[in-house]
Amino acid sequence: MKVVEVKHPLVRHKIGLMREGDISTKRFRELAAEVGSLLTYEATADFETETVTIEGWNGPVEVDQIKGKKVTVVPILRAGLGMMDGVLEHIPSARISVVGIYRDEETLEPVPYFEKLASDMNERIALVVDPMLATGGSMIATVDLLKKRGCTSIKALVLVAAPEGIKALEAAHPDIELYTAAIDRCLNEKGYILPGLGDAGDKIFGTK
């Protein structure tokens, strides 16, 4: 599995701000979208382009445009919604495919409860967004679902990843790509990333 830890100074700075314990909901939400935008920039760097001729202000001009498969952004509910606008900032025409999965706090296992995917998943590149890759369970379950629906090109975008989650995701889906703003130290006994960001969903939505 291709794993890219984006070490751009802006990304490192913004993730550092998100680690503040008393950060406001508004600020955390803004930063989640901003880092999601920067991760999208990295994740789409290998998109192919083609030269087309358009009518410019002074006659015909050749320009580059993205070609190939169309994109669908796949936020994992609920926290993934906080990164979605950052993706759409760069790819406003992307279809939105939604997957609902929550983690059982006792077993730490993923529990699917909702899905609404683009009808032509086999023709699309899926950019799956979820702030935290902890145990990897939710991301693995989401990729399982996307593959069952025919999607063969999948990139996962997360704010923070734990080594345990990366290892589990790679074992389950070695053919996808992972882009993360930070790889943190480890998981605690409750499956939370250390040092992490806390509960990203609670911080994005302001509710527990």
UniProtKB/Swiss-Prot annotation:
| Enzyme class, broadest EC rank | transferase
Q: What is its EC number?
A: 2.4.2.9
| Amino acids binding uracil | I193, G198, D199, A200
**This protein's UniProt keywords:** Allosteric enzyme, Glycosyltransferase, GTP-binding, Magnesium, Nucleotide-binding, Transferase
What does the record list as GO biological process?
A: UMP salvage; uracil salvage
Control of this protein's activity is summarized as: Allosterically activated by GTP.
Check the record and name the Gene3D superfamilies matching this protein.
Answer: 3.40.50.2020
Pathway assignment reads: Pyrimidine metabolism; UMP biosynthesis via salvage pathway; UMP from uracil: step 1/1
GO molecular function annotation: GTP binding; magnesium ion binding; uracil phosphoribosyltransferase activity
Show the Pfam families listed in the entry.
UPRTase
Lineage top rank: taxon: Bacteria
- The protein's name: Uracil phosphoribosyltransferase
Cofactor dependence is on: Mg(2+)
NCBIfam families according to UniProt: PRK00129.1, upp
Job description of the protein: Catalyzes the conversion of uracil and 5-phospho-alpha-D-ribose 1-diphosphate (PRPP) to UMP and diphosphate.
Recorded family membership = Belongs to the UPRTase family.
Q: Does the keyword Transferase apply?
A: yes
